[in-house]
Amino acid sequence: MPTGIFTNAWITQSAKILFRGSTPPDSTKFRLALANSASLGRTNSLADFISSELLPTNNYARAAASFSGDGTYETTDQRHELPVISASFSASGGSLQFQTAFLIADSLAVSSKSFTNSNVNATTDRIAITSHSFVNGDKLVFTADALATLPGGITAGTIYQVASVTTDDFQLQPNGGGSTVNITDTGSGTFRARSANGIIVAYAVESSPITVPDGQGYSYQIPLVVLNSGYVTGS
């Protein structure tokens, strides 16, 4: 795996956790996700990363990436070493191709749900997705598939908040709450409601796209260390 880089957002959040008492992420909700893009970087937003994530086809799913323990301080190398995370992906029904892997804290297991313009009610401002599993307050980003146009009132690259949930449909609010989003038309084609809970911790970009053939797997071993820059021994 290429060297991982912390995002600016995670560095800021870490400072708030360490020195201002902000709530740390749930240790069971770290997940590794994949994107077939080489253009994501440390300044990109959560919405940028989530909008680029692979679709849940050919068996793609976010991989659990939880630490098995606290790790130990390595006196020789002068750094605290956390247990290595193992995250695996497997292709089925077709290949998977990606170039960037990114770690999400406080994430949902589901990456995205698909729906079409026929599932959008511009009168009630509701989106119908059978057994969607979202709950009030969950964050979503919407994208349109090729040749599709998002419903009026929903903007690509914008994080929305799920509201007025039932088992099979929901409304939207602006991120952080507020009035129900007014859906002015149903749009056209197929869309994706992409899960945007959490924060992007770190990412790694491969030098060229990686293809996981149908029926095969690919594993990431993710080492994470904490150190004082300039004092560590080794690499």
Indicate where each model-derived feature is located.
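Small cysteine-rich, disulfide-bonded extracellular modules of the LU/uPAR three-finger superfamily
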Residues: 1-99, 105-111, 194-235
